[in-house]
């Protein structure tokens, strides 16, 4: 059955479309089923790019790309790899956010696997239904905190799907050995529970007493089925993500990109921002807006810079101020703090600061870092107040998607009179201000997670350690030259992502061997090993 010509043309991993040559068409029984012309992969890509640019909206472009992937996987990844800067905002932030919100309405075909609360006790058996022979990487979400959009439930599947497409394009994971997963534990979003097109289980989120055993069963089943797989947790709500990472990071090969990946990529940008302002790390005062998984993850990574400067953790924490919905986080505020917030709660405040503006006036920060998910929360008054006291303010407006950014790049440059070092989570176009062109930095996890995941997979790491995360950040930072840093550039161009991911993988593998985390016998040439494992989209299978 699977050798029928119709099956070959409908199998995205095998289909070449008009790329089948005449000999293949004869051998496979495809004569007459395709137009006569035989096209190269580049010719097919040129047409696909023309089709892509012809659509009027980014959501239409997103749907087109995913339909292409479901038709011809090789062509999709060839097109994506050669146009990554153009297409990354489509397959991932910010467009993927809209796609997730409209997942039920725009559903065309199933991708990945879904494990619901009703499947408890059957997850391992269900995994045998996955058609691929092996899996190297899983990205799993429960849909509870999708980007800055909140609880989308099963609609969040677009995030694991898009993330794995970036793993393939950025690092060279083999697409047939990737698995996107949704653990459907319900949703508390009334709109979706009442939406006739919603495809998930229609009940509120299950209690922790059921949730944690469900996740535990999933992980045990995954590592039983694929012992060398790496699992990346994605977009899981703050009330669960820290607990899951703490529970499993030393048991399985796994990491949380929202905590560790975000921390690593922002650490890299901060390293270069510090280089740019030419002020020692010990002299920086950092105000964070948002104390969730990403904010705490970033602060934990930045703490490593203080450690390298010989500053104790207790002393280093005095350089951090966290602001949440209730104001400055202090030990005397009177509310119940999570363990993550407690470690950064200020002990030296007998008075309460209720707003970000009050905190900025009080602290006079050198850096303000937004991971709040609240668009526009860096007001003109806040940024101008900060800029009064700092020659080169560091402004990181990192919330995704673009509509949730704390301020725009244009606002940051205007309100600081072009003096700030700016980075965002989603892309912004270059800004013209007073005759000068500013290119905003994008603190995109895409710089980190492909190379980090590839490293862990290639060397068969036992676990992903803090040292490996920090090594990835430092490697990324090294791609920006001193002369570029002084102009305000803090991240390299994404067009170099395969080179960046390869170098990060090599350096992280070296760190894994240094720490005794790598289980694969050490090769003579780590870089050669990494490159030998990287997928290249081609109809010549000898290249894959």
UniProtKB/Swiss-Prot annotation:
Residue span of region Disordered: 1-22
Residues that, per the record, bind NAD(+): 145, 258, 400
Main EC class the enzyme belongs to: oxidoreductase
Keyword Cytoplasm: yes
Molecular function per GO: malate dehydrogenase (decarboxylating) (NAD+) activity; malate dehydrogenase (decarboxylating) (NADP+) activity; malic enzyme activity; metal ion binding; NAD binding; oxaloacetate decarboxylase activity
Marked site: Important for activity: 258
Binding site for a divalent metal cation: 234-235, 258
Reactions catalysed according to its record: (S)-malate + NADP(+) = pyruvate + CO2 + NADPH; oxaloacetate + H(+) = pyruvate + CO2
A single cellular component GO annotation: cytoplasm
Subcellular location field: Cytoplasm
Annotated keywords: Cytoplasm, Metal-binding, NADP, Oxidoreductase
Principal localisation: cytoplasm
Binding site for NADP(+): 287-303
Pfam families per UniProt: malic, Malic_M
Cofactor: Mg(2+); Mn(2+)
Tissue specificity: Expressed in the fruiting body.
Family the entry assigns: Belongs to the malic enzymes family.
PANTHER family: MALIC ENZYME-RELATED (PTHR23406), NADP-DEPENDENT MALIC ENZYME (PTHR23406:SF32)
Subunit structure: Homotetramer.
Protein name: NADP-dependent malic enzyme
Organism: Dictyostelium discoideum (Social amoeba)
Originating gene: malA
């Amino acid at each position: 059955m699977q050798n029928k010509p119709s099956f070959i043309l409908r199998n995205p991993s095998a289909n070449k479309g008009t790329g089948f040559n005449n000999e293949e068409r004869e051998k496979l029984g495809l004569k007459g089923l395709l137009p006569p012309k035989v096209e190269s992969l580049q010719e097919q890509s040129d047409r696909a790019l023309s089709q892509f640019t012809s659509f009027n909206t980014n959501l239409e472009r997103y749907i087109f790309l995913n339909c292409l992937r479901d038709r011809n996987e090789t062509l999709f990844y060839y097109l994506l790899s050669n146009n990554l800067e153009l297409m990354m905002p489509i397959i991932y932030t910010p467009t993927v956010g809209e796609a997730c919100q409209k997942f039920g309405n725009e559903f065309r075909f199933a991708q990945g696997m879904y494990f619901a609360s009703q499947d408890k006790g059957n997850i391992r058996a269900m995994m045998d239904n996955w058609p691929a022979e092996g899996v190297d990487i899983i990205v799993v979400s429960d849909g509870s905190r999708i980007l800055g959009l909140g609880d989308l439930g099963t609609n969040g599947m677009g995030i694991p799907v898009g993330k794995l497409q970036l793993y393939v394009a950025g690092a060279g994971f083999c697409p047939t050995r990737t698995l996107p997963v949704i653990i459907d534990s319900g949703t508390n979003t009334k709109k979706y529970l009442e939406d006739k097109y919603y495809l998930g289980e229609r009940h509120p989120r299950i209690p922790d007493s059921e949730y944690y055993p469900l996740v535990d069963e999933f992980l045990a089943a995954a590592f039983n089925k694929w012992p060398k797989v790496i699992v990346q947790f994605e977009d899981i709500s703050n009330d669960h993500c820290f607990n899951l990472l703490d529970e499993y990071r030393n048991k399985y090969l796994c990491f949380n990109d929202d905590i560790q990946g975000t921390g690593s990529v922002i650490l890299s940008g901060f390293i270069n921002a510090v280089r740019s302002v030419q002020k020692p790390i010990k002299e920086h005062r950092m105000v964070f807006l948002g104390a969730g998984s990403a904010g705490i993850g970033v602060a934990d990574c930045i703490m490593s810079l203080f450690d390298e400067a010989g500053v104790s953790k207790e002393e280093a924490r005095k350089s951090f101020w966290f602001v949440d919905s209730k104001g400055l986080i202090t030990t005397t505020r009177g509310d119940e703090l999570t363990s993550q917030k407690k470690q950064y709660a200020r002990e030296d405040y007998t008075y309460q600061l209720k707003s970000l503006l009050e905190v900025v006036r009080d602290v006079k920060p050198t850096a303000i870092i937004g991971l709040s998910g609240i668009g526009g929360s860096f007001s003109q008054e806040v940024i101008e107040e900060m800029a009064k006291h700092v020659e080169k303010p560091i402004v990181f407006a990192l919330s995704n998607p673009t509509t949730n950014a704390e301020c725009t790049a244009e606002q940051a440059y205007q309100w600081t009179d072009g003096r700030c070092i700016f980075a965002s989570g989603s892309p912004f176009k270059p800004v013209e201000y007073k005759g000068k062109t500013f290119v905003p930095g994008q603190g995109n996890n895409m710089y980190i997670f492909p190379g980090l995941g590839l490293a862990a997979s290639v060397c068969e790491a036992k676990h992903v350690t803090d040292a490996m995360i920090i090594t990835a950040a430092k490697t990324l930072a090294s791609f920006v030259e001193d002369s570029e840093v002084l102009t305000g550039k803090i991240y390299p161009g994404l067009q170099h992502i395969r080179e960046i991911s390869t170098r990060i993988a090599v350096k992280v593998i070296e760190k894994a061997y240094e720490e005794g985390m790598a289980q694969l016998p050490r090769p003579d040439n780590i870089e050669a090993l990494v490159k030998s494992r990287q997928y290249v989209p081609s109809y010549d299978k000898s290249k894959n």
